[in-house]
Amino acid sequence: MGMLDGLTNMFKMHDDDDFDDDYEDYDDDFDEDYEDDKPSARKRLFTGSSKKDSVADEEVSYTAEKPRFASKSKVVPMKTQSARGLEVVVIRPESMEDAKEITDTLLTGKAVVLNLEGIHVEIAQRIIDYSAGSTYAIRGNLQKITNYIFLVTPPNVDISGDIPEIVTGGIDLSSFNKNENRF
């Protein structure tokens, strides 16, 4: 067996070999001291941390976090109607039953020009009373243009100027320069 002993001695494959005596157990403590730079997928799932978080941020907290809500604002946004979308409706009621149409139009945010010409005075008075009540209830505005024509507006429409003065021609047009082209 000389040749087989020579080969095993050469490869040190026999039992009396102490080849691992000089080897120290470096990997025995490896798992205890090792900190993973990237959290595992399971840890990220339950802690909510992303892959880019640092190791210091990865500490797991078992206390429940308080939900984060934006502070309640005391300002409530209001839908405003642009001047382009403003609509004026001319209504000429014939009976008291038509007064409901005035209120419905105001509730949609549209202004109403109420023409009561040609109606019996008592019915016209009842329609004005009804319209004044509904205008007051929605905090709108009711203005007399002439004896039989009224302007009824919802709260989102402001009326400026003196309407009867404008209708009767009470504005002095001489203050406008006709030679100057402003537009």
Curated annotation (Swiss-Prot):
Which residues, if any, are the signal sequence?
none
Q: Give one Pfam family, short name only.
A: SepF
**Protein's name according to its UniProt entry:** Cell division protein SepF
Disulphide bonds annotated for this chain are: none
Query: Mostly located where?
Result: cytoplasm
Q: Which UniProt keywords are given for this protein, alphabetically ordered?
A: Cell cycle, Cell division, Cytoplasm, Septation
- Where is the stretch described as Disordered? 13-58
Annotated localization: Cytoplasm
Q: Where is the composition biased (Acidic residues)?
A: 16-36
Q: Write down any Gene Ontology CC term.
A: cytoplasm
Q: What's this chain's function?
A: Cell division protein that is part of the divisome complex and is recruited early to the Z-ring. Probably stimulates Z-ring formation, perhaps through the cross-linking of FtsZ protofilaments. Its function overlaps with FtsA.
Biological process terms in GO annotation: division septum assembly; FtsZ-dependent cytokinesis
State the species of origin. Lachnospira eligens (strain ATCC 27750 / DSM 3376 / VPI C15-48 / C15-B4) (Eubacterium eligens)
What's the family? Belongs to the SepF family.
